[in-house]
Amino acid sequence: MASRNSVTGFALFSFVFAVILSLAGAQSLAPAPAPTSDGTSIDQGIAYLLMVVALVLTYLIHPLDASSSYSFF
């Protein structure tokens, strides 16, 4: 019975030692880089906004242009 307790104790000690040893050798994760906003995404957002404004103005002005008698010369 004494040998069974010593084997169980040794197995438990080995398991705990292996877990602690694997945690000690682990590397910490590198921190994530801070989010940055580059100029191209800002420029693209402004371009989309200007295209929407141009589209809305086109739809607002077009009925006025179509109803009047419009001539180039």
From Swiss-Prot:
Tissue specificity field: Predominantly expressed in flowers.
A Pfam family hit: AGP
Keywords: Cell membrane, Glycoprotein, GPI-anchor, Hydroxylation, Lipoprotein, Membrane, Proteoglycan, Pyrrolidone carboxylic acid, Signal
Glycan attachment points: 31, 33, 35
Lipid group attachment sites (GPI-anchor amidated serine): 37
Residue numbers bearing the Pyrrolidone carboxylic acid modification: 27
Membrane-protein topology: Lipid-anchor; GPI-anchor
Residues modified to 4-hydroxyproline: 31, 33, 35
UniProt cross-references to PANTHER family, sorted A to Z: ARABINOGALACTAN PROTEIN 20
Protein name: Arabinogalactan protein 16
Organism for this UniProt entry: Arabidopsis thaliana (Mouse-ear cress)
Gene name as annotated: AGP16
